Amino acid sequence: MARSKRVPLLILCAVVMQPAFSASLDELAGTERAAVLRTAAEPVTEVQQKNPRPRLLPRHGELERLVADIQSSLEPNLFVETLSLYQKPRAADWDNVEQINLLNQLTALSTLAGIQYYSESRKTMRTFYETSAVIDSPAKKTPLPDPVYAALPNSLLLYARQKDLTFGDNIYSFNFYTGEDYIFFVQENLTAMNAGIIPAIGKNKLHSLVAVIDSGDSLLIYAAAMAKTASVPGMGDRIGHSFTNRAKAILKWFTERAGGVF
């Protein structure tokens, strides 16, 4: 009898210790796009204006709902998407420890200071954020150390002050969401953004999203910027080009941060 009782217990332990189920890359991105992502040297990108809709959005229920909610409330006239793949080391399991460590890398917003992107107008690399810091609130703006979490929260809200060499010194909210196979964050501007003296994006009119989805042997990274841009001739094109290259800079930053986890 003692032996028969131990067998179910061993089976239960084996089940508990298994990593959470993740959809395959083919299921998330489609077979053709998955094949492109596996061999692409650069992220796949899409830029749309006027009446945009997602074209690169992975088939992931939570992410699809999040993007639909943002689109419904914002009604963007600019939608910039990028999709790329991060190949995990063989030893990586996407277990709870790795997820917590990855979240802590993503909430280290001070590390965004100094990252570079390619400026289409200047035809050279340029600093994206000159400064970046977590703050206590949009009102007080007191700088805080990057937060570190010992457990994985379902959601959390951070505020940040970031000085952008193109759009100036602005305050943002960062909403993070986590689940068995994903970590998402959405950055929203809480102050109006100007390109010099030219109004570019009004308050709460930019939502930038980064979604990290486990797909077994890799992580699928979806980044999107949805914006309601000012009605200034040429502004949509200018911001579209800028945001595409900025998204690539964020993906490079993510790759470097993920390298410290896996």
Language-model features, listed with the residues they occupy:
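A short acidic/glycine-rich loop-to-helix N-cap element
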Residues: G196-I201, A227-R246
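A short, solvent-exposed beta-edge/loop patch
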Residues: S208-R238
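Hydrophobic ligand-binding cavity/cleft-lining segments
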Residues: A23-L165
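Bacterial N-terminal signal peptides that target proteins for export
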Residues: M1-L9
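Hydrophobic-ligand binding "helix-grip"
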Residues: L158, T166-F167, I171-L209
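Bacterial N-terminal signal peptides
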Residues: L10-Q18
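C-terminal partner/receptor-binding element of secreted or periplasmic proteins
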Residues: G240-F262
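A mature extracytoplasmic/lumenal domain signature
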Residues: Q162, T178, Q187-T191, G216, ...
